[in-house]
């Protein structure tokens, strides 16, 4: 529960998640595993192209900045395994498996320069930007790594 109430370093004390939302219930069984092991389990559970894509994105994120750490947040009954999160002095990006896409959400994405136009959703938000990856689409690894590095730098500034 403390993870829900604890804000990222250098940020306020507002909880993560929807405003006014109650802290999600913790999943029994995965709490003892490290975040990396929990993400491994999420990848094993996510079959087909979406699991493969999330694994590819994870590798790119980890390779972009060795200081980025893995976390799992927002466990709740409808998603007991939680959501993969990559942080460095605050959240850099969040990975979500959707019905027809794998989404990387950047909580401070509106502040990032995106010269290659990777952001393709949440474009109306004043703070958040996201990228939906669909089956068969290529990943622009260099541009994605640049966004990861920018996001981590922004958190440290």
Each PLM stretch: what is its role?
Residues 2-12:
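Extreme N-terminal basic, low-complexity initiation segments
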Residues 5-6, 16-157:
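Charge-dense, helix-prone N-terminal extensions
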């Amino acid at each position: 529960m403390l993870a829900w109430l604890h804000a990222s370093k250098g940020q306020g004390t507002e909880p993560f998640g929807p405003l006014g939302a109650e802290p999600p219930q913790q999943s029994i069984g995965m709490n003892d595993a490290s975040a990396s092991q929990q993400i491994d389990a999420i990848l094993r559970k996510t079959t087909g192209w979406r699991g493969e894509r999330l694994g590819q994105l994870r590798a790119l994120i980890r390779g972009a900045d060795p200081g980025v750490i893995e976390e799992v947040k927002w466990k709740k009954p409808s998603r007991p395994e939680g959501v993969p999160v990559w942080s460095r002095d605050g959240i850099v990006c969040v990975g979500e498996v959707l019905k027809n896409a794998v989404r990387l959400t950047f909580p401070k994405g509106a502040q990032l320069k995106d010269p290659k136009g990777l952001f393709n959703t949440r474009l109306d938000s004043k703070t958040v930007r996201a990228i939906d990856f669909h089956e068969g689409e290529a990943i622009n690894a260099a541009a994605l790594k640049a966004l990861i590095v920018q996001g981590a730098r922004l958190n440290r500034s």
